[in-house]
């Protein structure tokens, strides 16, 4: 039987890893006024898009396929069904929502989608961190530190659109806090309630749908806004930088 002390330590470290998103969220306090969209917002949105697209295809999609059976045709097919299912869900939501006329409305919706998608992604990630620390071994500290570093750009990606849409930097920071706290909550829910029903197949489909949701958000909301505010050339550069930052964090995670 697992000791209560071990469970407490695992939960504490999961909380710390999740709260690393707040470090990324703190960046909003060091930016200039968020009252009106400008070139800097376009840069931030493009950078956030790079982060989310890269992590969707190289981490979340891959995790989904592994959970659904690994390198098999069936697993790849189910992962794609979940991926395009997530896109379809977002498209349906967009179809029933009222049309966004003001720029701030576009930015707010992009921010809300980003918070929702990242939070969903962080629930199972929190459980994974919790279990890795609980099981111990050499992989535990590496998993903890890598996921913590990996969460920093995610916090930035969700905080900036909310800060610009509302003109309130604290609200942007709060959105990163909400996203990060999903990890310890996911650990608790998974450990006490969802473990009996959270099969590999269910987890895989959730990951696949989350991947589709994040990609749809980037191409439908974040990238068009970045093109509007900072232009094509700078958007491409910043998207590529987003790829690079998240790639480095995933390389660290794989050590």
State the predicted function of each range.
Residues 1-255:
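Intrinsically disordered, metal-sensing/regulatory segments
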């Amino acid at each position: 039987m697992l000791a209560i002390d071990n469970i407490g330590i695992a939960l504490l470290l999961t909380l710390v890893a999740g709260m690393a998103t707040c470090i990324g969220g703190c960046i909003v306090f060091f930016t200039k006024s968020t009252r009106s969209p400008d070139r800097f917002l376009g840069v931030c949105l493009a950078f956030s898009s790079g982060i989310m697209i890269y992590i969707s295809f190289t981490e979340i999609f891959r995790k989904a396929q592994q959970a659904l059976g690994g390198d098999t045709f069936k697993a790849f097919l189910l992962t794609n069904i979940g991926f395009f299912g997530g896109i379809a869900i977002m498209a349906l939501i967009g179809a029933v929502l009222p049309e966004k006329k003001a720029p701030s409305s576009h930015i707010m919706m992009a921010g809300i989608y980003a918070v929702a998608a990242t939070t969903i992604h962080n629930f199972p990630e929190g459980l994974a961190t919790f279990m890795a620390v609980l099981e111990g071994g050499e992989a535990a500290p590496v998993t903890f530190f890598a996921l913590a570093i990996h969460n920093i750009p995610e916090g930035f990606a969700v905080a900036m659109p909310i800060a610009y849409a509302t003109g309130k930097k604290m609200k942007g920071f709060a959105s990163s806090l909400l996203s990060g706290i999903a990890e310890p909550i996911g650990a608790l829910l998974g450990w006490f309630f969802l473990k009996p029903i959270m099969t590999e197949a269910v987890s895989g489909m959730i990951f696949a749908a989350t991947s589709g949701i994040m990609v749809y958000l980037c191409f439908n909301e974040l990238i068009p806004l970045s093109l509007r505010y900072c232009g094509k050339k700078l958007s491409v550069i910043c998207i590529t930088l987003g790829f690079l930052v998240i790639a480095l964090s995933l390389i660290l995670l794989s050590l």
